[in-house]
Amino acid sequence: MAAKSDGGGVGVGFAQLHNLDEAVGSGEEDGEPGGGGCGGGDGSEPGESSSLHICHCCNTSSCYWGCRSACLRSLLGKKPRRSAAAADGGDQPLQPPGAAGRHPPTPSAGRPQPASPQVERPWLDCLWIVLALLVFFGDVGTDLWLALDYYRKGDYGCFGLTLFFVLVPSLLVQSLSFRWFVQDYTGGGLGAVEGLSSRGPPMMGAGYGHGAARGGPGAGGSATPGAQRLCRLSVWIWQSVIHLLQMGQVWRYIRTMYLGIQSQRQKEHQRRFYWAMMYEYADVNMLRLLETFLESAPQLVLQLCIMIQKNSAETLPCVSSVTSLMSLAWVLASYHKLLRDSRDDKKSMSYRGALIHLFWRLFTISSRVISFALFASIFQLYFGIFVVVHWCAMAFWIIHGGTDFCMSKWEEILFNMVVGIVYIFCWFNVKEGRTRYRMFAYYTIVLTENAALTFLWYFYRNPESTDSYAVPALCCVFVSFVAGITLMLLYYGVLHPMGPRAKVFASSCCAELLWGIPLPPDVEPMAPQTPGYRGTQVTPTRAVTEQQEDLTADTCLPVFQVRPMGPSTPSGRPYHPEGPLIKIDMPRKRYPAWDAHFVDRRLRRTINILQYVTPTAVGIRYRDGPLLYELLQYESSL
């Protein structure tokens, strides 16, 4: 990889990361204004600066303790450094070297601001994550409770199967989560950056070194080797304990919420916190998707099959089945919402659309699972054969369709085989383009299979033990399927972000949050603006009128999303921020695949290291995309 300038900023390569001492030294000679320390060395309040700068506690580009001022060394000596900083003038805002004459204009320098301040609603996004945590705890907790109940009753067969479908998927997912942590925290990921200046990064200004010399705000910036080892060891111990306790996903959810809140509090580093949150949220959603179809789906079929065989529906197995079903539907809705939110070439899914999506999945999966349980209660061997045949057919269909998710051919085939497991239970879009014909074919096959499995059970069942629920079970299978398809048509016809819904503009905060009305851009997409203030949402693929802009000017926006606005210079021209671009020398993957910098840990490492070097922000661009993917500030080739 190499990094180069596009003419708007200073070219920086990875080799230059080893010469930051010289960069700081040259800044000192020029007498540039200084700033505070990094990694808690400035004694600033939590959240005053980005947690994505180099942490001088552990010499890494990501501090896993959260905000940089919440590092261990900062917590130990926070008050003395704060008083020294106040006496030395160290409480001034941090400024990058040479930035005095090129700061982006404030909101007052742009277009006129609304008379009433915009009301942000962090509760909606926080509530979504809190509900995801509750669904997770409810699913796993009821399964463990049910396994313990089987053990107390002496039903060791059901106890073993129930516990197996809880522990094995959890161990696999926690191993993958810990592997991602290792990649992000070592040289293979975000990594320890060798050769960093102990006096602080150049973006902190030359005063950092002078402050350290006189006991000012930079005095804590030089971490001794022992302190660095202690901090890194504490991070490793913390993450190891978290994953051994099978709580890796819980930690990622909490960290996602923290970064999202910080993206709203910290206007100076809003973009960095926002994308750190997007990376973390993407990771936890992919982990949850994998665990759900390895744990919740088999668990749901197992418990329904046990209840049918025993001809009894006790409270605890029913609760476990309901939570497993809810977990499946929730994860699918959350995954698709996040995938759309992460792509600038697609409109975001509203919360109303996500809710309808959730119930669509809830009903179709219910129909599928009930038919599975009915058939498996009599034909266990044939049910296993059916599942294997269906999985092979779906995997072949997906491979034949030509997906574009992974970097290599064999990884793509493995991914398609995993998606084939998802196709056993529900539809999962993996290819760009119109999906109506593929969905019609899939749901026709599913309806045929559900009907065949259910009627085979009905004709071969024991009438004496099943007459009480045979007809209601048949009704459940077909009514649930029809309800799910109806909700799917409602979603695609009315609530889909690109669907033919009514052209209604948001007139209130609630309407905007629920409908997800896209806001018009102020400037051309090729000149993305510095974020940090709530203005308009860049939607490069859709032209809008000035009337639409006036209608949406006073609405509030969903939190945890950076909405760039286009401030103007006194001359009336759009402000073009300085700085190079991240240029990824590979074609951009088509929707519904993730962008490469979400799934490729090397690209994440590149972005985070480049993010450390220069504070200005411009954008990211893929090789075949004429539009800028708004993110950071460099042009890098892979």
From Swiss-Prot:
Question: Where on the tree of life does the source sit, at the highest rank?
Answer: Eukaryota
Q: What keywords is this UniProt entry annotated with?
A: Cell membrane, Membrane, Transmembrane, Transmembrane helix
- Mind telling me which residue stretches traverse the membrane in this protein? 127-147, 158-178, 315-335, 369-389, 410-430, 439-459, 470-490
Its annotated compartments are:
Cell membrane
- Renumbered to this chain, the Gly residues biased-composition regions fall at 33-43
Give the GO terms filed under biological process for this record.
apoptotic process involved in development; engulfment of apoptotic cell; phosphatidylserine exposure on apoptotic cell surface
Annotated membrane topology is:
Multi-pass membrane protein
* Cellular component GO terms, alphabetical: plasma membrane
Q: Protease among the record's keywords?
A: no
| InterPro entries documented for this protein | XK-rel, XK-related_scramblase
Q: Where is this region: Disordered?
A: 24-43, 82-117
Family statement drawn from the similarity comment of this UniProt entry: Belongs to the XK family.
Query: What is the protein's name according to its record?
Result: XK-related protein 6
From which lineage does this chain's organism come? Eukaryota, Metazoa, Chordata, Craniata, Vertebrata
